[in-house]
Amino acid sequence: MSIMSYNGGAVMAMKGKQCVAIAADRRFGVQAQMVTTDFQKIFPMGDRLYIGLAGLATDVQTVSQRLKFRLNLYELKEGRQIKPKTFMSMVSNLLYERRFGPYYIEPVIAGLDPKTFEPFICSLDLIGCPMVTEDFVVSGTCSEQMYGMCESLWEPDMEPEDLFETISQAMLNAVDRDAVSGMGVVVQVIEKDKITTRTLKARMD
């Protein structure tokens, strides 16, 4: 069994029209054994910037804390909010530093540029190689199912409510086909003037 699927989990991000959405499941388990159903996998890294971490649960918490530390140092030094692309480089550097004994996580970043409010999404592998796309990114144990759902449902330039519906349906249907993820979904829709957080009920078996 791969260490990446030891705890299970699924994270996804999508672009819309002047908005982005990021979603993650809530399950934390050890292989087939369930531990909790409210595990945090999406972390705020700015006013309109979020990171979702799928992979080994211990590394999820370690990396989120180390990123917060580096982010605070950056904002103190620069005196401004970090741009999503710069934050992607920060995450990439953190992961690549540990390439010979990596953090077993695959991050997904979603946010809006603090000045232009341009939507940005990307995913990285466990040694920090980034992939920036214009539609959607996925990470976790049911990535094949998530890709299938996203390719079926995603459309360009969706309004925030349509984007929420699309990412919710894609996520709920993908995690239903994976034994080690699910137990509810948290969705954040990031817009220019507000962030909407919704918790969705899912199958609990």
From Swiss-Prot:
It is found in: Cytoplasm; Nucleus. GO terms for biological process: proteasome-mediated ubiquitin-dependent protein catabolic process. Disulfide bonds: none annotated. InterPro entries: Ntn_hydrolases_N, Proteasome_beta_3, Proteasome_bsu_CS, Proteasome_sua/b, Proteasome_suB-type. Keywords: Cytoplasm, Nucleus, Proteasome. It comes from the Eukaryota. Its main location: cytoplasm. GO terms for cellular component: cytoplasm; nucleus; proteasome core complex; proteasome core complex, beta-subunit complex. Non-catalytic component of the proteasome, a multicatalytic proteinase complex which is characterized by its ability to cleave peptides with Arg, Phe, Tyr, Leu, and Glu adjacent to the leaving group at neutral or slightly basic pH. The proteasome has an ATP-dependent proteolytic activity. The 26S proteasome consists of a 20S proteasome core and two 19S regulatory subunits. The 20S proteasome core is composed of 28 subunits that are arranged in four stacked rings, resulting in a barrel-shaped structure. The two end rings are each formed by seven alpha subunits, and the two central rings are each formed by seven beta subunits. The catalytic chamber with the active sites is on the inside of the barrel. PANTHER family: METALLOPROTEASE TLDD, PROTEASOME SUBUNIT BETA TYPE-3. Belongs to the peptidase T1B family. This is Proteasome subunit beta type-3. It comes from Oncorhynchus mykiss. The gene is psmb3.
